[in-house]
Design a protein with these regions (language model features):
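Thiamine diphosphate
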Residues: 1-130, 135, 152, 369, ...
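Anionic-ligand anchoring segments at beta-strand to alpha-helix junctions in alpha/beta enzyme folds, i.e.
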Residues: 22-58, 272-298, 417-481, 485
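Short acidic, glycine/serine/threonine-rich loops at helix termini
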Residues: 34-39, 68-70, 91-95, 116-122, ...
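Phosphate/diphosphate-binding loops
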Residues: 326-348, 352-388, 478-492, 498
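ADP-ribose/adenylate-binding Rossmann-like module
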Residues: 501-523
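Conserved small/polar residues in nucleotide/adenosyl-binding loops
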Residues: 534-543
Length: 551
């Protein structure tokens, strides 16, 4: 293995490239960079495990890409695709066929919200939850490192089990977050690949030399029985996924499980979640457990098929309160999907804990340690609110939890936090991407970069969030405590609270064309007061005159 700095999309694309012979693509935000990366590698002659460049097929829509995925798999080629949101919805008819015919295709999905009352390009789990009934295996990653590792596991297990996989991770929050990770090399995974299963897959392919009949119409006399005959494949699937998790664990030294437990062994309150929120919850648990709490987290990796036995084994027997967090909304349902699975796991069992559920993070709404605290405060009430929302103020139906008090920075103590305010297309985001990759590649620092911006291609507000630390960074939320803040557009001084959250010894850099005299007049009083508060006590005029005018 080698260390490399990349985002979640690149990690998933690299994992898929090893095992893919044909890639059927159609671009859609935020999954497009995966197809772009595969296209670039194939064009430069990069080889997969079979010693050939990937054959890329770009179709007219996601429906065409799904049809190509289906047909290519029927023809005996290991095929992948990359999509999200409405694109995944267009693939549903083919997913039923692919799963029903036991074809080992893999879809890598940067999970994104669906267009309902409005369209949003940002991340949640609405699209993935819309395909859970198709029979496709759903495997969740919560970080850039997991995108690499579980991306490989999805392909390894798909071929071995003859089952199609959707490997999904949070759009933007994970797909576009840059981290330094361990990259699995070809020699690391070649020996793990089930080459016999590949040969059997090719033998079952449609071939005029040994014709078979598929895709028939069946009548009531046999359809039910044949549909039920697929059950053994799903019953054995969890063990297959864990088998390859164990093999990846041996190579990497990590500990992947179908349901990973993190926290106090005798926890009385346990969170259940999947995706990038798990990193936030882990960081919050570390902070709170050192202060006397007994908290834990069960991170769901294998969501479908949901293995109740493996899930219950992961939850400590000491748990008295369970909080299930879903990053989706299913209007009219008795509860959100993960919540219902967890409730069902304890149905009819004696001594079941109190189980409540809620929603968070729709359309990439930031999920912070303060939100974890709000959820914790709620579950400890005498009558906790069920079906709650967190991170927003719901003044219509009153489902939102009251905001918790802000807690100190839960990131590593040595973590340096930097924010850059920029203007879409001014180069701030691109420069920061280059800088963080250089620092990650040429120093021993762990790095994290996330870029907050709206749907406009250019001309909008951008805020770059960069973190640097000697230890791995799990802070999958926007920076609230900054050591360094730079503003690259002087107009922002009147439009935004630029210095909100700056540390006492923080640095503020303003890129502007004003002279020292103009600076004293142009800067808003609030910004000046903040600068005075965090500098040595001196006359205001003197402070103004010392402030830099450009960068």
């Amino acid at each position: 293995m080698r260390k490399e700095t990349m985002d979640g999309n690149t990690a998933a694309a690299l994992a898929s490239y090893y095992f893919t012979e044909v890639a059927a693509i159609y671009p859609i935000t935020p999954s497009s960079p995966m197809a772009e990366a595969v296209d670039k590698w194939a064009a430069t002659g990069r080889k997969n495990l079979f010693g050939q460049p990937v054959k890329l097929v770009e179709m007219q829509s996601e429906a065409g890409a799904a049809g190509t995925l289906h047909g290519s798999l029927q023809g005996g080629a290991l095929t992948s695709t990359y999509t999200s949101s409405q694109g995944l919805l267009l693939m549903i008819p083919n997913l039923y066929k692919i799963a029903g015919e036991l074809l080992p295709g893999v879809l890598h999905v940067s999970a994104r919200s669906l267009a309902s009352n409005a369209l949003s390009i940002f991340g949640d789990h609405q699209d993935v939850m819309s395909v859970r009934q198709t029979g496709v295996v759903l495997l969740s990653s919560g970080s850039v490192q997991e995108c690499m590792d579980l991306g490989c596991i999805s392909h390894l297990a798909a071929v071995h089990s003859r089952m199609p996989f959707i490997h999904f991770f949070d759009g933007f929050r994970t797909s576009h977050e840059i981290q330094k990770i361990d990259v699995l090399e070809e020699e690391d995974i070649r020996e793990l690949f089930d080459w016999d299963a590949v040969e059997q897959f090719r033998t079952r392919a449609l071939n005029p030399e040994h014709p078979v009949l598929r895709g028939t119409t069946q009548n009531p006399d046999i359809f039910f029985q044949i549909r039920e005959s697929v059950n053994p494949f799903y019953e054995g699937l969890p063990d297959t996924v864990q088998l390859y998790m164990d093999k990846i664990n041996e190579i990497t030294g990590r500990n992947y499980r179908l349901f990973n437990y993190y926290g106090a062994p005798d926890a009385d309150t346990v969170f259940i979640a999947m995706g990038s929120s798990c990193e936030v919850i882990k960081e919050s648990i570390d902070y709170l457990n050192t202060r006397g709490e007994k908290l834990g987290l069960v991170q769901v990796h294998l969501f479908r098929p949901f293995s109740t036995d493996h899930f219950l084994q992961a939850v400590p027997a000491s748990a008295k309160r369970i909080v299930v967090l879903d990053r989706t909304k299913e209007p009219g349902a008795a509860g959100e999907p993960l919540y219902l699975d967890v409730r069902n796991a304890w149905f009819g069992r004696k001594g079941a804990p109190v189980i409540i559920g809620g929603r968070y993070g729709l359309a990439s709404k930031d999920f912070r340690p303060e939100d974890v605290m709000a959820v914790l405060d709620n579950v400890r009430r005498k009558e906790p609110k069920n079906g709650f929302t967190v991170g927003i103020t719901d003044d219509v139906t009153g489902l939102s939890l009251p905001a918790a008090e802000k807690i100190p920075d839960t990131a590593p103590a040595d973590c340096v936090n930097c924010k850059f305010w920029g203007f879409g297309s001014d180069g701030t985001v691109s420069a920061n991407k280059s800088a963080v990759k250089i620092i990650g590649s040429h120093t021993d620092q762990y790095v994290q970069a996330y870029f907050a911006y709206d749907s406009k291609k250019s001309g909008g507000l951008t805020v770059s969030h960069l973190r640097f630390s000697k230890t791995p960074i799990r802070s999958s939320y926007l920076i609230n405590h900054a050591d360094y803040i730079a503003c690259h557009n002087q107009a922002y001084v009147d439009s935004f609270h630029l210095l909100e959250g700056i540390r006492e010894d923080g640095i503020f850099l303003l890129n502007c064309i004003w002279t020292d005299e103009e600076l004293a007049e142009k800067l808003p009083e609030e910004l000046i007061e903040t600068c005075l508060l965090y500098t040595s006590p001196s006359p205001r005029d003197r402070t103004r005159s010392r402030m830099p005018s450009s960068a």
